[in-house]
């Protein structure tokens, strides 16, 4: 890849990106560099579910990771970015069941083994789709190390962790209330339950006291669970019911006697202050039942139909039973009233059905000891660093209030629980391997929650439980995890405590938290709103580099991003600007050698010194911002340097030399252009891998790919404050004259007189020394630079730092319009002065900010005040002339 090729005349992202990824793969550029002296840097990709195509959130998440990986690779680190996918138990099984249902087939028709074969076929199909999407995004993943959560090695790790926790008493089997999906017929974790507002009602029911002395009124939204009531609860301090505690009521319709109990769980100010307690169908009621030793009566089957404990309602669907029970309560005089209301109801994320709280025998992880260990680790120098820091509070709050984790799922797709039951004795055996006399045992049919295996992802993918595995020793703990704030508890926290428990190390040094991708109106993207965006369609239109630029340059850690086609247009335009500027530079390089060395100071003119100083500052800023994960600010820094400094100013200034006759100056300018372009492409490469590779291959270079070229470094000798000061003054002057021309509709072809009234003496030397330079860019009829100049009566005026610019345009000047413009400028300057005054009056700023920063703000205020006086004076002159 060392010979350069000619760039096409137009930027076409499809042409640029097509085939490039395969070139990288063929060259094995995504693998670690295998240099034992290089410092390792590793990231494991958050494994996407094999349920379908990736969305914009995945594109954002993986682009941030790829930026880090590509930069570290260029900085000489031994880099590993490990890819993989998650089997996504219930999500994938639900998809396959839905597909089979279209053919009129259920999983039960196929049986467990054949159904799992169907799921593997699904996995292979969608894994191929995900691979294709990763390639189109340009992700530099080491596919030789790709993992899947059901791989043999990862399955070994899962069994070892389960057995170890079980032997420590941290995994147990018990009867508890869990979230239940009656369609999928499985337990759900909290994250698999989506809450939405449904229309419902409060049904007020009279429960008669058994002794005939009266009744007690309760209100419920779930009359279908009434057959499972085993008590009425009131608050111990509620005087209304004090004399009723200890008595009993007769359960309406069921004719069963249940006690009235006192429990602090009851809110005496809510509703009637009396609650029906159904321990088998509500988690809070379950806890109340435990405290009072109440029986647990389950009145529903797995499919949410009523069972024999529901009496005459046996066999009815739960919602049919609700109607029937309400009708019977009304007919028998127990129904007092019905108050319609809207309330939040949990629904299965995968099947959409209303979730039931169900009493079930499940496997659980005892969370308190593990959570305490994770919290204690956050007080050490081996803590996991959250970016932004505020998300550590989120993590801490969740860990301090954690409940035991139900890990069993009534599914077929997943890691089957390594527990067996003896067919004759019922004895339970838990182990990494099946019992030797397996014919006498039956394995637990449940599988583990998907989060159980993904909690082991950072170390199981590296070869653990073999702690001598080369990758585990070299690349674990990993350096950075990139993920969304919505799964801090469900995934991030579990990786932390499992890693600490089994490796005694944190799983990663930093967690970079990003937000959600929203539409232009700020709404979350969803199927129901129909506002989802397919990243592949965006790439087809704009290219991957433009999408990557949009996703990163507009992002701030922890904040959401709004997708916008207008911003995508801007991203494409920026790349097109880079393309055209690069093409101009390359077309003018001729036999210029590869820019492998920093340009020599003796060969630099003022513009060269300035652009190299600006480049040097950009390198320092972007490197620092990347280290702090401030990709949005890094993007803005790059944009300003490339668009403004390099393209709009330096290249335009370079043309004056390139089109001249001084061959030595031309050669020096060509080399400097090549050097700045080369360094700029390297800075851009982590975020725009395709177009930077294409341009780099088209210019003189050494090495096979920009991906393995060294990342730009700061060179102290390139810092040139004097050149920066001079060029900033010249640019301000040229820009001010151009603005005057634009406002007066005076094109460059029309010569104009220009007077520069110097107020800051050092400017005199700068402008005088560079008068020829100024004239080339402002095209004056005459140019006068002096102190004490008087503004012509009718002239356009521009105020720059240290000088006033007058352009006599009597025949073109609209006096009223100029007065209005200067009044606006006066208002703007007044706002800047007040802002600076407010900042300097803030002791928090003056006491804490570096003295250099405070002094810069004082200088700004003084400059604004001087400009204000100049504008005010000029305004008075024009008003007098009117």
Curated annotation (Swiss-Prot):
It is found in: Cytoplasm. This is Valine--tRNA ligase. HAMAP family: Val_tRNA_synth_type1. ATP binds at residue 527. The gene is valS. Its main location: cytoplasm. It catalyses: tRNA(Val) + L-valine + ATP = L-valyl-tRNA(Val) + AMP + diphosphate. Transmembrane segments: none annotated. Residues 844-866 are annotated as: Disordered.
């Amino acid at each position: 890849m060392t010979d350069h090729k000619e760039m096409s005349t137009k930027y076409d992202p499809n042409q640029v990106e097509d085939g490039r990824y395969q070139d990288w793969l063929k060259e094995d550029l995504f693998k670690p560099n295998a240099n034992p002296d290089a410092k390792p840097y590793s990231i494991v990709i958050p494994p996407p579910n094999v349920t379908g195509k990736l969305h914009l959130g995945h594109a954002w998440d993986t682009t941030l990771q790829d930026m880090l990986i590509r930069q570290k690779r260029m900085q000489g680190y031994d880099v590993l970015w490990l890819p993989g996918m998650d089997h996504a138990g219930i999500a994938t099984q639900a998809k396959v069941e839905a597909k089979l249902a279209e053919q009129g087939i259920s999983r039960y028709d196929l049986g467990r083994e054949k159904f799992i074969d169907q799921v593997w076929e699904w996995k292979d199909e969608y894994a191929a789709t995900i691979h294709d999407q990763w390639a189109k995004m340009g992700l530099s993943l080491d596919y030789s190390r790709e993992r899947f959560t059901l791989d043999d090695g990862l399955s070994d790790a899962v069994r070892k962790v389960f057995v170890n926790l079980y032997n420590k008493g941290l995994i147990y089997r018990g009867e508890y209330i869990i979230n239940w999906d009656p369609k999928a017929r499985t337990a759900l974790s909290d994250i698999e339950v989506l809450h939405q507002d449904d229309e419902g009602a409060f049904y007020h029911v009279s429960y008669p006291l058994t002794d005939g002395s009266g009744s007690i009124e309760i209100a419920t939204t779930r009359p279908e669970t009434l057959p499972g009531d085993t008590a009425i609860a009131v608050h111990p301090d509620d005087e209304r019911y004090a004399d009723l505690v200890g008595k009993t009521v007769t359960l309406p319709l069921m004719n069963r006697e249940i006690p009235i109990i006192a429990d602090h769980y009851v809110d005496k100010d809510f509703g009637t202050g009396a609650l029906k307690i159904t321990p088998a169908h509500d988690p809070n009621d379950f806890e109340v039942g435990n405290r009072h030793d109440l029986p647990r009566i389950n009145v529903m089957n797995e499919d949410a139909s009523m069972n024999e404990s529901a009496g005459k309602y046996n066999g009815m669907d739960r919602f049919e039973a609700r109607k029937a029970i309400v009708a019977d309560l009304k007919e028998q005089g127990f129904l007092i009233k019905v108050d319609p209301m809207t309330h939040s109801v949990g629904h299965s994320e995968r099947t959409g059905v209303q979730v039931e709280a169900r009493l079930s025998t499940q496997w659980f992880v005892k969370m308190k000891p593990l959570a305490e260990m994770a919290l204690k680790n956050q007080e050490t120098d081996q803590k996991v660093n959250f970016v932004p820091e505020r998300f550590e509070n989120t993590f801490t709050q969740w860990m301090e209030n954690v409940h035991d984790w139900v890990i069993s799922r009534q599914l077929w797709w997943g890691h089957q629980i390594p527990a067996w039951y003896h067919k004759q004795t019922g004895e339970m055996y838990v182990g990494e391997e099946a019992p030797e006399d397996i014919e006498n045992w039956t394995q637990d049919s449940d599988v583990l929650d998907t989060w159980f295996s993904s909690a082991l992802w950072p170390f199981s993918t590296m070869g653990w439980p073999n702690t001598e595995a080369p990758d585990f020793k070299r690349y674990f703990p990993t350096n950075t995890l990139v993920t969304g704030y919505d799964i801090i508890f469900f995934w991030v926290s579990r990786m932390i405590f499992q890693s600490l428990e089994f490796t005694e190390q944190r799983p990663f040094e930093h967690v970079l938290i990003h937000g959600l991708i929203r539409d232009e109106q700020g709404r979350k993207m969803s199927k129901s709103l129909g506002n989802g965006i397919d990243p592949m369609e965006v790439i087809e239109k704009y290219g991957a580099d433009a999408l990557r630029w949009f996703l990163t340059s507009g992002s701030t850690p922890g904040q959401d991003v709004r997708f916008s086609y207008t911003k995508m247009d801007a991203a494409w335009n920026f790349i097109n600007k880079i393309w055209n500027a690069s093409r101009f530079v390359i077309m003018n390089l001729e036999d210029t050698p590869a820019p492998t060395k920093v340009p020599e100071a003796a060969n630099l003119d003022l513009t060269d010194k300035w652009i190299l100083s600006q480049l040097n500052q950009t390198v320092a800023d972007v490197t620092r911002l990347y280290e702090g994960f401030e990709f949005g600010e890094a993007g803005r820094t790059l944009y300003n340097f490339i668009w403004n400094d390099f393209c709009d100013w330096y290249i335009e200034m370079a043309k004056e030399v390139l089109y001249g006759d001084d061959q030595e100056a031309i050669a020096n300018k060509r080399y400097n252009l090549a050097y700045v372009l080369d360094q700029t492409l390297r800075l851009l490469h982590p975020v725009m891998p395709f177009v930077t590779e294409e341009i780099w291959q088209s210019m003189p270079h050494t090495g096979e790919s920009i991906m393995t070229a060294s990342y730009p470094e700061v060179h102290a000798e390139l810092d040139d404050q004097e050149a920066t000061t001079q060029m900033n003054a010249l640019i301000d002057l040229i820009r001010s004259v151009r603005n005057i021309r634009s406002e007066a509709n005076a094109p460059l072809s029309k010569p104009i007189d220009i007077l520069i009234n110097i107020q800051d003496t050092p400017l005199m030397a700068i402008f005088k020394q560079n008068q020829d330079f100024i004239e080339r860019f402002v095209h004056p009829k005459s140019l006068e630079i002096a102190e004490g100049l008087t503004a012509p009566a009718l002239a356009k005026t521009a105020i720059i730092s240290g000088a006033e610019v007058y352009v006599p345009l009597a025949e073109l000047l609209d006096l009223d319009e100029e007065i209005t413009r200067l009044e606006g400028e006066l208002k703007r300057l007044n706002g800047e002065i007040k802002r600076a005054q407010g900042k300097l009056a803030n002791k928090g700023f003056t006491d804490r900010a570096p003295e250099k920063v405070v002094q810069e703000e004082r200088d700004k205020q003084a400059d604004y005040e001087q400009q204000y006086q100049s504008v005010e004076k000029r305004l008075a002159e024009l008003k007098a002339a009117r």
